Amino acid sequence: MPTYANTFPPYCIAPGDQAQVWTSADGNLASGTKTQRIAITAGGPATRGRLSLRVSFSGAPGVISLQLHTSDTDVDTDYNNEGAAIAAVNASNVARAEYANVAAKFARLLATTVTNAVTATVELAA
């Protein structure tokens, strides 16, 4: 698991954009993993935006708890849970969630629990 670091600026997404914050090349998406973060730009005068999260596992992940983390500052300890945790995947081992009122400036995924050793691709879209 990569160590969380904010040495380099994060990818920035605006409404209509998406970014991969974890790929299979990053290794297994294991319990306790935090993905890379993204910066979210405002889409005009609106102060809150939409954000969607898609996690595609290479196989059955077992028991999962995936949590969108958001923050107004890019400080690891300032990230907080946004909405309810994702606890299920579909028949293709894909988990997806939408968040309608995100006002934070940064977002990432916390894989609180993943019981099977599987790789994944994680995408965040505005």
Describe each region flagged by the PLM:
Residues 1-20, 122-126:
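Short, intrinsically disordered N-terminal pre-domain segments
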